[in-house]
Each structure stands twice: as structure tokens, then as C-alpha cells.
């Protein structure tokens, strides 16, 4: 039978499919559905003994501090600057929410850092956070 499932928590558009307290750009605050589907999935996985894996896009076209837009936007589209450190704090904040609000998480699948290959993603800091919380 099925051993695990992976669900998208946030894709490149930055829209969170979970109840994020860090941003209102999420399923709870911006849709009529107003249900946390990651919570629903976590509960179903626990009930059926299936490991829950979370897909999370590190690139975020919506967040004002994700600048420049990177390769997918040909480094264009925003006249403002942006604060990379602030964006990384935001990203790690959302990861903290995901790793502390939904029970046991089997793993995380990152995507999108390829969009800004030359950026300092500070992956060691993110990986240390994951291991600290998990």
C-alpha cells in the first residue's frame, strides 16, 4: 500500500495552502474555502499511518523582498529593491509553522532555489532549523 504522500504547501506564486500567521496570502485569509488543507491532510495521514511529506517552493514571486525575480522573471518586473535577509527570515518562519503545527512530518521537498543560483540561500541555517524542529 501507499507509504507516503507529498502535498504542495506553497508554490512559486507564494500562496500558502496552510494557515500562515506570517502572511495573509494563504488559503484561510484569501479564499471562501477557509480551511487549512495541510491540517486536513496531516490528520488523514496520521489516521491511515501514511508519512506526510511537504513540498515548499523557496522562490516566491509574490513576496516583495524576493528581489530581483531571478531567472524566471529575467531579473525584471519590480522597480523596488527588496531585503534578501528579510525574505529568508520569512521563508524560515513559514517552515517553522509547517514543522510545528502539523504533527510528524516525513520530509520536505524544496524547489525553486535554482531561480537564483547565485544568491546566498543560507541553506545551512535552514537545514539547522529543520533538524532543530524535527
Residue ranges with predicted function:
Residues 1-134:
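Mature catalytic domains of secreted/periplasmic carbohydrate-active enzymes
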Amino acid at each position: 500500500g501507499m507509504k507516503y504522500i507529498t502535498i504542495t504547501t506553497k508554490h512559486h506564486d507564494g500562496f500558502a495552502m496552510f494557515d500562515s500567521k506570517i502572511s495573509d496570502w494563504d488559503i484561510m485569509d484569501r479564499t471562501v474555502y477557509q480551511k487549512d488543507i495541510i491540517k486536513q491532510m496531516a490528520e488523514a495521514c496520521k489516521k491511515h499511518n501514511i508519512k506526510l511529506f511537504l513540498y515548499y517552493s523557496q522562490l516566491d514571486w509574490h513576496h516583495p523582498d524576493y528581489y530581483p525575480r531571478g531567472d524566471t522573471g529575467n531579473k525584471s518586473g519590480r522597480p523596488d529593491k527588496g531585503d534578501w535577509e528579510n525574505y529568508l527570515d520569512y521563508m524560515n518562519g513559514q517552515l517553522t509553522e509547517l514543522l510545528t503545527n502539523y504533527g510528524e512530518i516525513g520530509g520536505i521537498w524544496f524547489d525553486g532555489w535554482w531561480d537564483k543560483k547565485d544568491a546566498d540561500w543560507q541553506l545551512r541555517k535552514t537545514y539547522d532549523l529543520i533538524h532543530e524542529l524535527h
